[in-house]
């Protein structure tokens, strides 16, 4: 992958990717031999590139971009994780650290990635022409996005399987008596607080029809003894996975021109469904108890470090910074697009969606607690157990249960598809911008990316596939993505320079970011990311799935997966340093100087070697 050898002499780039600063707002003449531009008082002569005759494609409409960003950021975690975290960590009090981290870290990082992609008009790898040593960060986030595609599509396939299973008069997770049920299967109507006892929460009870349908009917987990015994792929999930991958391919094969139209459905449909579920949910008996539990305010919980840690990690993963998606999406914007307004709007929509979804979730949980005569805490849970066990079970008791099941799983399907589309686009754009042969064969390359995710996802749809999925979900995009974004923030804010980055934004939109944003980029956001990275390592616990404890070798494999992306950062620095001609001083200078300023190295005029560069804000 690391094929390009840098020449220290000043040569025009010829990678075919159109960049913002070299595409002025006025129409350019293709016959020009030289373009003179000024950046930070330094005039650079830039030879026009071969790709200038074919300018970079842009979104068909501005709304296509906004819906794509919202669709990517608003995913399954908004439904199955945030509401439970809010409930668990003091209810309304949790919104204080959550909002604080949104303002001082989430939004600044979101804004930074959009501006970075829009100005340079490059994917996650080639955007690092601003600081060549950091190109390994781009490769790292591309690999992480690919890893996520291996297992995230499987969760979408589960949703599709549930959707197909919902087209029956009697939902299959309503009662016992099916081939997948165990002798211990218990009618939910017979379960209450006295039957369960004091030590068993309803959400953890494994013998309800809904729980057995998920673990035995869908996953076939009972046929596997652990991660060492995964078995063969299940044909039902195989077909669903094929459908998901085919939909993804035809959504992405022509770039943003097709994906920008698909998100009109996948990004908006969940809001209609969420509204319908919310309106119906609040009318159910016990719903008010669930909502009160969700919104209860316990300020004393703010004294606990875990509350702040949960808020920090949730805001980071919720916004989706660091996967290369925001950079890729923004690279197809018009150069003068107001990405500042876009960042504020889309990040706010994402967080508001998380909060509102809690009402739809906890109204149903309150209803379940009322029906089974247990406390809210006995039914409250997060993750797959919420959306594939508890919520479907609650739906099965409603009048017109088939309709509500179809509506709910259509929402999950839409939430998953546009998020997966974003991850795949990050991989495709990131590599296609780096290797022009891939860009020239976009359709074939898109097929290769989607098909590779299909092949490796086969391990996750085996009888023990949930163990593989849990391993990937924990390690593939955990500490590694936090590390990658930390490096990204340092590369932009310190090596490239906040002042220079602010000037780039001024060229695009006509105004410089305020002091608040510059301080966040240079100090607050890197400190926030460093804090989250350290906490994620300190709080690591050996991997488990319910009562199953993963063997030690599985944890080592997991850390190997995590390190496989992180090591790309130092490996590329070493590669770039060794492959560059010149003295040690010149090699270092070329590695930290933007490519369009390499002529300054010969003049020994390097910003990064001056104290003023590091102190500038």
UniProtKB/Swiss-Prot annotation:
Membrane topology label: Multi-pass membrane protein
GO biological process, one term: response to pain
Binding site for dopamine 2: 382
Impact reported for residue 75 to N: Abolishes norepinephrine uptake
UniProt modification remark: Palmitoylated; palmitoylation regulates protein levels and neurotransmitter transport.
Effect in UniProt of substituting residue 459 to A: Decreased homodimerization and norepinephrine transport
Binding, (R)-noradrenaline 1: 75, 145, 149, 317
Clinical disorder: Orthostatic intolerance: An autosomal dominant disorder characterized by lightheadedness, palpitations, fatigue, blurred vision and tachycardia following postural change from a supine to an upright position, in the absence of hypotension. A syncope with transient cognitive impairment and dyspnea may also occur. Plasma norepinephrine concentration is abnormally high.
Chain's role: Mediates sodium- and chloride-dependent transport of norepinephrine (also known as noradrenaline), the primary signaling neurotransmitter in the autonomic sympathetic nervous system. Is responsible for norepinephrine re-uptake and clearance from the synaptic cleft, thus playing a crucial role in norepinephrine inactivation and homeostasis. Can also mediate sodium- and chloride-dependent transport of dopamine.
Family (UniProt): Belongs to the sodium:neurotransmitter symporter (SNF) (TC 2.A.22) family. SLC6A2 subfamily.
Name of this chain's protein: Sodium-dependent noradrenaline transporter
Species for this entry: Homo sapiens
